[in-house]
Amino acid sequence: ELTDSSDPLQVAKAIRSAFGYSTFYVADLDAILSGPVHSDVISSLVKDGFDVLLDAGTGDADQVDGLSESVKLNDLAGVIIGLESVPKPEYLSLIKQRFSDLPMAFSLDLMNGVPITHGDLWQGYSPTSILDIALEAGMDSIILLDLASVGMGTGNRCLEHCDYVKMRAPDVNVITGGGVRSREDLYELEAHGCDGALVASALHDGRLS
């Protein structure tokens, strides 16, 4: 194991020391579940030189504005807008219009290929139709994540969606994760147009070094 610490900053430092990585996807689960934002943790990561992509459960423009009261948004590498936090499709364009200068990533959250949605207004939308809405809204990056693959080491399940985004919008940054277990998996993601990969378990247990 890289570290026996559960402190986020110490974990991040251990990963940076071992692999040289300084960009982190940070999911603040308390904030996602409508609790407080761990602004002290975010600030400590930024202060130590880490680039933070933050998912704090922001699903509309007012929530992004509220996040700015806890975190300096301009200090972040980007704010993540997760599908499971967005109640209405039209909110994606409204968020991006209001915060046009803020780097923003839309995360297509799936479970076994099925979109994880917030409320009934997303019913009937396929993964590709949701991606179309995010791209038309002007999202800077797209994150593709099938939660059924996370931590399982069974390979990535989002390759067809990576292909789709790159076909529709070649200049949009595409990041995917879940199930990455080897360098070969990373090469495969690159072949499907991915610009980045979310990796955790394979770093912690030494499968990737």
Kindly label every feature range from the protein language model.
Residues 1-49, 62, 74-76, 103-106, ...:
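Conserved N-terminal beta1-alpha1 strand-loop-helix module at the mouth
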Residues 16, 42-47, 68-71, 92-100, ...:
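Surface-exposed amphipathic alpha-helices with a cationic face
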Residues 28, 54-58, 83-85, 106-110, ...:
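A cross-domain feature marking catalytic cores of carbohydrate-active enzymes
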Residues 53, 80, 105, 141-143, ...:
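A structural signal for isolated positions on well-ordered beta-strands in alpha/beta enzyme cores
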Residues 64-114:
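Hydrophobic, well-structured mid-protein blocks that either form specific transmembrane helices
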Residues 92-98, 186-209:
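C-terminal helical cap(s) of enzyme catalytic domains, especially alpha/beta-barrels
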